[in-house]
């Protein structure tokens, strides 16, 4: 073994006592190279193999075991990725339950604790590219589960409810308080007074096309609509606003004649059915025509403007029709109530 002054000792690797040693600028002898580079720089999740450097990476890629694992991955990559994703999610949530069950903590803190495990599933092996995407996925999943629970509670209240009584359920957005909610859940009694006489309930009325009408009697507080119903209703209103126009002429519809051509949206060239004469008429002078039940009609105004549909039924009292869309994005959708003025017979 030899000794040099600290001022003259360079930074490098020397053979000391027959072993490869690293000498830093301060003159301290550190452990050998293999110990200094023990931290893996490359990890194969499928092979559960860690490589320290580029040479080890190349050697492993050429090995037979790696080729077999790549063949397994190529046969069904979706199943493999989903498997790692489920394992990552389960382990991440288990760590949260154990370490941060009753506290609010940042996702990065939990993730840093998670990756301390040398055998953890790496994020690159899952279907989430970043931790942010994974957290958004957890939030979305929790929201869907909450909606399902809300819908199930509404069904139970509708089945078990009776006139004059209501089941009051307090919803809490915090999943950590599930046990507390279950303990505090109680059925509250609602006081009510009857008048001198009670009107007997008649037979339930029918809807336009033979469907039984649901009981619409108010029982105190109005029931909350599910988020899905609200979204669907808003989407219908948006489409109605966008497609509701003050003109409705389309080529190929029958209006006591056949519209051969539409001019400036409001004027059409009409071919008379009997005389075959062609006239130019403003839409104010025209009226829509309805075929027999089962005939084809075009929706000329409203949310589904331009769609070809089949006439299923008519309600002469409310001047509405029931149609089913054929072809297109909304193929098969049934519109239970649409006004006569919004549909017209196809030629």
Curated annotation (Swiss-Prot):
It is found in: Cytoplasm; Nucleus. Gene3D superfamilies: 2.30.30.140, 2.30.30.30, DNA/RNA-binding protein Kin17, conserved domain. A motif (Nuclear localization signal (NLS)) lies at residues 222-225. GO terms for cellular component: cytoplasm; nucleus. The keyword Nucleotide-binding does not apply. The keyword Nucleus applies. Keywords: Cytoplasm, Nucleus. Its main location: cytoplasm. InterPro entries: C2H2-Znf_KIN17, DNA/RNA-bd_Kin17_WH-like_dom, KIN17-like, KIN17_WH-like_sf, KN17_SH3, KOW_KIN17, Rib_uL2_dom2. Belongs to the KIN17 family. May act as repressor of root growth during copper excess and of hypocotyl growth in the dark. This is KIN17-like protein KLP. The lineage of its organism: Eukaryota, Viridiplantae, Streptophyta, Embryophyta, Tracheophyta.
